[in-house]
């Protein structure tokens, strides 16, 4: 995922892409936004979409189908070349970028 696809520059790595710790944090943002959507709409994991009013879409200025959101989570968590850096213990975004999580 290229940084140009993400409007919040706080999530960009030094090389212009999303680095592994932040990839994990973005996945957490997606999951939290989905849970928020599900709680508000009583939707299921297999249907619906994240509307432009959802917290995730407000943060990234996007609208996405839930299946796309889950593919994004899988990519961010499991398709990293450096899986160790992508673990929860290395997630530094919460400490370095509190506004990202305050927006949730």
From Swiss-Prot:
Protein origin, superkingdom: Eukaryota
GO BP term (any one): ascospore formation
Miscellaneous comment in the UniProt entry for this protein: Almost completely overlaps MON2.
Name under which the protein is recorded: Putative uncharacterized protein YNL296W
Classification lineage: Eukaryota, Fungi, Dikarya, Ascomycota, Saccharomycotina
């Amino acid at each position: 995922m290229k940084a140009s696809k993400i409007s919040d520059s706080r999530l960009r790595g030094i090389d212009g892409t999303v680095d592994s710790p932040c990839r994990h944090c973005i996945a957490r943002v997606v999951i939290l936004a989905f849970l928020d959507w599900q709680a508000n709409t009583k939707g299921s994991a297999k249907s619906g979409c994240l509307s432009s009013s959802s917290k995730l879409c407000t943060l990234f200025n996007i609208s996405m189908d839930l299946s796309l959101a889950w593919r994004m989570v899988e990519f961010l968590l499991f398709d990293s070349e450096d899986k160790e850096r992508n673990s929860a213990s290395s997630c530094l975004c919460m400490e370095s970028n509190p506004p990202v999580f305050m927006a949730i």
